């Protein structure tokens, strides 16, 4: 059974999330009581992963509409609609790179604008749509796993010849980054379930260590054969291990031409895949495809605090929280959270609707998205 990082009680409208800052040493669920809690959880990376961020943001507002005390079904529809729209705009400021959040905000603002009826009916419509968003994400991820498995079995030589393959991945793209199952890690789960996976190699993903803290946690939990490596070992690993047939990454934003923003380090993996002639695929829901942004150069890249690079958090021998400084005091730091893989180095983009591939060396994601 895969992990459940988001727990939403539809009947009582309560939300708790697994505190990912405490993983892998502690598994603690924290309550999200309103949109302020949601914003802080996203900003502080208590929850992370583009799909999960959007889901927690919307559900945090759903909880607030029921329990927050700032809005009432006795108010006018205009007052409730204005409150929801203002809170959505606020939530959208928590993390700017992930398109899922801005898309969800836009979708729910449209619901506010188009839903007719009373304030109570508007609140009910919001609650229903937010719960559906949670349920749909799990099924979407399983579909991504299915389509990714099929593509790999046809296009990765070892798998096409009936042999097991190994895969390389970065960051965390599993149940901890989504409503469940995962995107890139969902494909890896599908490979494992089908008996196709020999081993997955997970990059530690500095400086926040989502690979060593979160992906490794999921892989151990699910009993998937896995090996953890540092980010700087990727080239040596690919040169040594010929059985690694595919690199699978997630996406925070896929733009019109196919350039894909993802965790810092993704760009170098796309270069390595090209150099070593390995397949490089992106796993993302269609909600992560942003056809309004033309290329990777137009993506706003979030920069994180310097302290995330100069200090490391963990626990001591007694499992007490511990923060250790690992850099020379006074050193300047550049700490972008993301980079982007250019579309020319991407073999396929796997979504819940199917697989987008290049024709004549170009992706046509506008047509792909509209057709699906």
UniProtKB/Swiss-Prot annotation:
Q: Which SUPFAM superfamilies match?
A: NagB/RpiA/CoA transferase-like
Q: Which cysteines are joined by disulfide bonds?
A: none
Q: Name one GO biological process term.
A: L-methionine salvage from methylthioadenosine
The UniProt GO MF terms for this protein read: S-methyl-5-thioribose-1-phosphate isomerase activity
In Pfam terms, one family for this protein is IF-2B
Annotated active site = 252 (proton donor)
Where in or outside the cell is it found?
Cytoplasm; Nucleus
GO annotations of cellular component type: cytoplasm; nucleus
State its Enzyme Commission number(s).
5.3.1.23
Task: State the UniProt keywords alphabetically.
Answer: Amino-acid biosynthesis, Cytoplasm, Isomerase, Methionine biosynthesis, Nucleus
According to its UniProt record, in which pathway does this protein act?
A: Amino-acid biosynthesis; L-methionine biosynthesis via salvage pathway; L-methionine from S-methyl-5-thio-alpha-D-ribose 1-phosphate: step 1/6
Specify the superkingdom. Eukaryota
Record site: Transition state stabilizer? 171
Reaction(s) catalysed (UniProt annotation): 5-(methylsulfanyl)-alpha-D-ribose 1-phosphate = 5-(methylsulfanyl)-D-ribulose 1-phosphate
Task: Give the function comment from the record.
Answer: Catalyzes the interconversion of methylthioribose-1-phosphate (MTR-1-P) into methylthioribulose-1-phosphate (MTRu-1-P).
Q: Which family does it belong to?
A: Belongs to the eIF-2B alpha/beta/delta subunits family. MtnA subfamily.
Provide the protein name.
Methylthioribose-1-phosphate isomerase
Please give the organism.
Yarrowia lipolytica (strain CLIB 122 / E 150) (Yeast)
